[in-house]
């Protein structure tokens, strides 16, 4: 079945409401394998931050999960696809940046918290830049989530679990960078 971006996003949000666990990578893995999530695409602008919000809530973080996910979907749907290559900022990072802003309730007129999430986004973008391209929405999500887990622990005192990340999406990614990817699974061979 072919889904619109709105339908993909609605299914992601519905899945997050139902899923347990405090590991954003495991939440991502459970949802990213569904038919409504493509290998690459702007649904990641909703999915990546939604996994962080879900894990944060499940770990005891103080948010109204339904309202937070709806707000994230609104923000994520406003981000166009291919911003990584066209604007120089990755949608995985902006999605999680939006999730952090939702947790804090910050906006463009916030004073003391205004720049705090930029510390996260700049660190995550620096890590992505070091890996290089071409883009991979899965690899970028993994890097952005890893960076977010330590940020969330330091900023909010909420511990999210994070198991070692191993990518199983390589066979479906025609542009996989293989062993240059920090998450490449050896059984998928050299590229």
Language-model segments: which ranges?
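Cys/His-rich short segments
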Residues: 1-6, 170-171, 178-191
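A structural-propensity feature for long, helix-poor, extended segments
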Residues: 103-153
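A short glycine/serine-rich beta->alpha loop
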Residues: 30-42, 78-88, 128-132
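Polybasic, low-complexity association/targeting segments
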Residues: 15-49
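Short, contiguous, pocket-lining structural segments
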Residues: 40-44, 48, 88, 136, ...
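Conserved mixed alpha/beta catalytic, RNA-binding, or beta-rich assembly cores of soluble enzyme
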Residues: 46-59, 66-114, 118
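C-terminal domain-closing interface element
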Residues: 139-168, 181
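Non-catalytic, interaction-prone regions of core transcription and DNA-replication machinery
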Residues: 2-28, 78, 82
């Amino acid at each position: 079945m072919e889904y619109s971006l709105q339908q993909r996003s609605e299914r992601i949000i519905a899945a997050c409401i139902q899923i347990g666990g405090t590991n954003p990578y495991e939440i991502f893995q459970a949802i990213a394998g569904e038919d409504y999530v493509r290998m690459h695409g702007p649904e990641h602008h909703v999915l990546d931050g939604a996994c962080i919000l879900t894990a944060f809530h499940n770990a005891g973080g103080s948010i109204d999960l339904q309202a937070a996910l709806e707000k994230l979907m609104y923000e994520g749907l406003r981000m166009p696809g291919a911003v990584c290559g066209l604007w120089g900022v990755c949608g995985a990072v902006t999605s999680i940046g939006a999730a952090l802003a939702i947790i804090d309730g910050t906006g463009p007129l916030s004073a003391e918290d205004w720049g705090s999430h930029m510390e996260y986004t700049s660190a995550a973008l620096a890590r992505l830049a070091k890996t290089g391209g071409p883009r991979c929405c899965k690899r970028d999500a993994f890097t952005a989530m890893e960076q977010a887990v330590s940020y969330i622990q330091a900023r909010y005192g909420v511990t999210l679990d994070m198991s070692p990340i191993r990518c199983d999406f390589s066979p479906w990614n025609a542009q996989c960078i293989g062993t240059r990817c920090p998450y490449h699974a050896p059984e998928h061979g050299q590229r």
